Each structure stands twice: as structure tokens, then as C-alpha cells.
UniProtKB/Swiss-Prot annotation:
GO terms under biological process: mitochondrial electron transport, cytochrome c to oxygen
Organism: Heterololigo bleekeri
Membrane topology: Multi-pass membrane protein
Chain segments annotated as transmembrane: 13-33, 36-56, 80-100, 125-145, 154-174, 195-215, 237-257
Gene name tied to this protein: COIII
Molecular functions per Gene Ontology: cytochrome-c oxidase activity
Name this protein carries in UniProt: Cytochrome c oxidase subunit 3
Keyword tags: Membrane, Mitochondrion, Mitochondrion inner membrane, Translocase, Transmembrane, Transmembrane helix
Family: Belongs to the cytochrome c oxidase subunit 3 family.
Function: Component of the cytochrome c oxidase, the last enzyme in the mitochondrial electron transport chain which drives oxidative phosphorylation. The respiratory chain contains 3 multisubunit complexes succinate dehydrogenase (complex II, CII), ubiquinol-cytochrome c oxidoreductase (cytochrome b-c1 complex, complex III, CIII) and cytochrome c oxidase (complex IV, CIV), that cooperate to transfer electrons derived from NADH and succinate to molecular oxygen, creating an electrochemical gradient over the inner membrane that drives transmembrane transport and the ATP synthase.
Length: 259
């Protein structure tokens, strides 16, 4: 990438390694479900993680050390992040469509009732309600970090980011415990399938968002962000707020109404 108002990138191997990694990971994971292909899956995972690390390292170099991220470049990245979150909204919309398609007009195969016969749904006022409070609190702390960063208060920004990462990890642990104690599985009719797919993909997004925030915390500690140049943090915060909103819809529709 050269220094000019527009986003002109240099030659990079990472799109190629990333696409190869995605292919190997998909093929390997599909094969792993049939008891083979574990090595292919590990190779794909390694390539994806390596590409993520190296590509983000290059972007950080361009923005923090070389000063290539002008206002026009930053605007383009903001538009890209907005489009990415829009695609994620469509992704989760498909799961909610599947859920309501099955729940609003239950098939006779599941007893013409929702939840299906012999399915004991989780109590929405136990772990799910605690997880809701945790994610809402994490949304407050990440906003606190953002305002502290814009105000030049490095200590408060760091402390609030630590709290956000801890809350994200705590949510993941509680979700894993909920899965282990659930009285039904993903194989228990369309209810189990839609429940675990929707909440499982949300849990994956929480893990991804926690990794984003952890990287931002590390960059805060080495003073990569300034009061007016911190889009990496803003993108992670947008993603985290998106995860919060999806969870509120999941809790309302699947845990509370669906039970």
C-alpha cells in the first residue's frame, strides 16, 4: 500500500492462504463428522489462524507505524465493517426464520405443539437470564472503554477492557455449562437442532468477539490507539454490540417465548 488518500493495497499472499485455509477447514470438518479428515481440518485451522495473524499484523503496521490509513481509507474500512455486520444479520435471520417456521406452525411429527412433546426446555430465568445480564454489563464496559479512550484516559480504558474480556469469557463458560446440563440434544427434533445451531453460532461469535477485544486490550497496553485514531477498537466494539443485540433476540424468542 502506498501513501495516498485512497486505499491501494500492495501484493499480498494472505487472500490466497486464507481461501485455501477456509477450503481445507470446511472439507476437513465435514470429513471429521464421518470419522476421518482430522489432519485436513487441523491444516485448514492452522492456515486460517496464520492468515488472520499475519494479515492483521500488516494492517496494524500500515495504520499505526506507516500512517497509510487516511480519512478516506478509514471511511472505506468503516463501510466494510458495516457491510460485514449486515451480512451477519442475514446469517442469523436464517436461523430465526427456521425457528419460527417450525414453532408457529408445529408439525404433527412433533405432536403439533411447541416445545415438542417430551422436550423439557431450559428455564429462561436461570443461566440464560444471568448470561443476559453478563452481556449487557459487557456492553456497558466496552462503551466505557470507548469513551475513556476518546477522552485520553488510558488507565480507565484499559481497566474497562479487562472487565469486558472477563465478562465475555464468563459468558462462554456459563454457555458451555448450560450445554452440558441441557436435558435435550441437537438430535432431539427440530427444537434441539434450531436451539443448538442458533445459540451455538452465537456462542462462536462471542468467542470471536472476545478475541477481537483481547487483541485491542493488548494494543491498548502498548499504546497503539490515540484519542482520534482507533478504528480497530471501534470495529471490535461494533461487533460486540451486535453480539449483544443478537443475544437479546435469542433470549426473548428462544429461551423465554419458546419455553
Amino acid at each position: 500500500m502506498i501513501r495516498n488518500p485512497f486505499h491501494l493495497v500492495e501484493y499480498s499472499p494472505w487472500p490466497l492462504t486464507g481461501s485455501l485455509g477456509a477450503m481445507f477447514l470446511t472439507v476437513g470438518l465435514t470429513s471429521w463428522f464421518h470419522n476421518h479428515g482430522f489432519i485436513t481440518m487441523l491444516l485448514g485451522l492452522f492456515l486460517v489462524l496464520m492468515t488472520m495473524f499475519q494479515w492483521w499484523r500488516d494492517i496494524i503496521r500500515e495504520s499505526t507505524f506507516q500512517g497509510y490509513h487516511t480519512m478516506k481509507v478509514s471511511l472505506g474500512m468503516r463501510m466494510g465493517m458495516v457491510l460485514f455486520i449486515t451480512s451477519e444479520i442475514c446469517f442469523f435471520f436464517a436461523f430465526f426464520w427456521a425457528y419460527f417456521h417450525s414453532s408457529l406452525a408445529p408439525n404433527t411429527d412433533i405432536g403439533a405443539s411447541w416445545p415438542p412433546l417430551h422436550i423439557n426446555p431450559l428455564n429462561p430465568f436461570q443461566i440464560p437470564l444471568l448470561n443476559t445480564a453478563i452481556l449487557l454489563a459487557s456492553g456497558v464496559t466496552v462503551t466505557w472503554a470507548h469513551h475513556s479512550l476518546m477522552g485520553g484516559n488510558h488507565a480507565e480504558a484499559t481497566q474497562s477492557m479487562v472487565l469486558t474480556v472477563i465478562l465475555g469469557g464468563y459468558f462462554t463458560l456459563l454457555q458451555a455449562e448450560e450445554y452440558m446440563e441441557a436435558p435435550f440434544s441437537i438430535a432431539d427434533s427440530v427444537y434441539g437442532a434450531t436451539f443448538f445451531v442458533a445459540t451455538g453460532f452465537h456462542g462462536l461469535h462471542v468467542i470471536i468477539g472476545s478475541v477481537f477485544l483481547l487483541i485491542c486490550l493488548f494494543r491498548m497496553l502498548i499504546h497503539h490507539f490515540s484519542t482520534n485514531h482507533h478504528f480497530g477498537f471501534e470495529a471490535a466494539a461494533w461487533y460486540w454490540h451486535f453480539v449483544d443485540v443478537v443475544w437479546l433476540i435469542l433470549y426473548t424468542c428462544i429461551y423465554w417465548w419458546g419455553s
